[in-house]
């Protein structure tokens, strides 16, 4: 596969397609945009001229799966906290 060039060029050229990919997984445009932006922000300091499109698609997919997992864990923790704080019914 051909390298995608520098981060700015790659983002302009492939950002919309990467957001669509993320949106299909997350079912939220806002979250998809956040995931793609975060990916590029994290990649910029260690960008390599060898970065290609399949790498970016795989990275976005992995970020989305991590996002879903983290949201699931967060929801579970909130449920536990709510159960611990909720007043218990008194039995007479």
Locate the predicted segments by residue.
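A short, charge-rich alpha-helical start-of-domain segment used by transcription regulators
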Residues: 1-20, 30-33, 44, 48-53
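Amphipathic alpha-helical segment used for protein-protein interaction
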Residues: 2, 13, 83-92
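Short amphipathic alpha-helical interface segments enriched in basic and hydrophobic/aromatic residues
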Residues: 12, 19-23, 27, 40-48, ...
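Solvent-exposed, flexible loop/coil residues
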Residues: 30, 81-82
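Arg/Lys-rich amphipathic alpha helix in sigma70-family domain 2
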Residues: 51-53, 58-80, 87-89
């Amino acid at each position: 596969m051909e390298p995608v060039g520098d981060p700015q060029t790659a983002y302009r050229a492939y950002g919309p397609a990467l957001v669509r990919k993320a949106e299909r997984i997350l079912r939220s445009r806002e979250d998809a945009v956040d995931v793609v932006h975060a990916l590029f922000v994290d990649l910029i300091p260690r960008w390599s001229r060898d970065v290609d499109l399949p790498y970016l698609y795989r990275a976005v997919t992995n970020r989305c799966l991590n996002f879903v997992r983290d949201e699931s864990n967060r929801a579970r923790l909130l449920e536990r906290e709510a159960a611990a704080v909720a007043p218990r019914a008194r039995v007479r």
